[in-house]
């Protein structure tokens, strides 16, 4: 539904040079979030759609823990300086593209759009009467654009509702989020 805002053009898109007000309200309100997610993945060489679901816990300024429940259980945790898949910890510098994206997103969540603007060409859309927004980003720097075609985030002033990731190889991932009222005791550390 949020992605439809971008596709239907119900509002005027603007190129981002500073933090739009609704996006700023969203980042200011973001603290600790626990959400369920559903994910669909399509591969360019297949007509089959792959589905997954699970939970994610995000703590602003700390990182996130992604717990997939189906089809296979696994955990991915990202902190400010490391990441781990299940219990295998690695330095974040071992994944330079992910490290760069994580740094850009951290700055953006802290209210600083400068590294985002340096790394991405971005269009931002707000609906005319609600609280919804869509941010579509196309990478400008080679560390990111060598593998990523675009990333679209959609939400409102309280929640991220959807993320769409399009990779250079044609793979497309659509993730829908739903905030949960219960808190997770999961620690975000590797």
What residue spans do the PLM features occupy?
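One face of beta-strands
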Residues: 31-39, 52-56, 64-66
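Hydrophobic h-region of N-terminal signal peptides that target proteins for export
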Residues: 4-13
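Short, mixed charged/polar active-site loops
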Residues: 47-53, 73-75, 148-150, 172-174
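N-terminal leader/targeting segments and the immediate start of mature chains
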Residues: 12-48, 189-190
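Gly/Pro-enriched, hydrophobic low-complexity segments
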Residues: 113, 117-190
């Amino acid at each position: 539904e949020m992605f439809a805002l971008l596709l239907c053009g119900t509002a005027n898109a603007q190129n981002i040079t500073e933090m739009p007000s609704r996006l700023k309200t969203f980042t200011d309100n973001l603290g600790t979030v626990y959400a369920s997610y559903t994910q669909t993945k399509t591969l360019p060489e297949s007509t089959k759609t792959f589905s997954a679901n699970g939970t994610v816990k995000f703590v602003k300024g700390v990182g996130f823990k992604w717990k997939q429940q189906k089809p296979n259980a696994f955990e991915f945790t990202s902190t400010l300086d490391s990441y781990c898949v299940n219990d295998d910890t690695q330095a974040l510098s071992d994944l330079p593209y992910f490290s760069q994206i994580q740094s850009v997103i951290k700055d953006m969540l802290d209210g600083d759009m400068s590294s985002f603007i340096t790394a991405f060409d971005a269009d931002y859309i707000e609906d005319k009467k609600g609280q919804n927004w869509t941010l579509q980003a196309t990478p400008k720097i080679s560390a990111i654009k060598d593998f990523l075609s675009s990333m679209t985030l959609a939400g409102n002033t309280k929640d991220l509702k959807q993320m769409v990731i399009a990779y250079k190889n044609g793979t497309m991932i659509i993730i829908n989020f739903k905030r949960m009222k219960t808190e997770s005791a999961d620690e975000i550390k590797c």
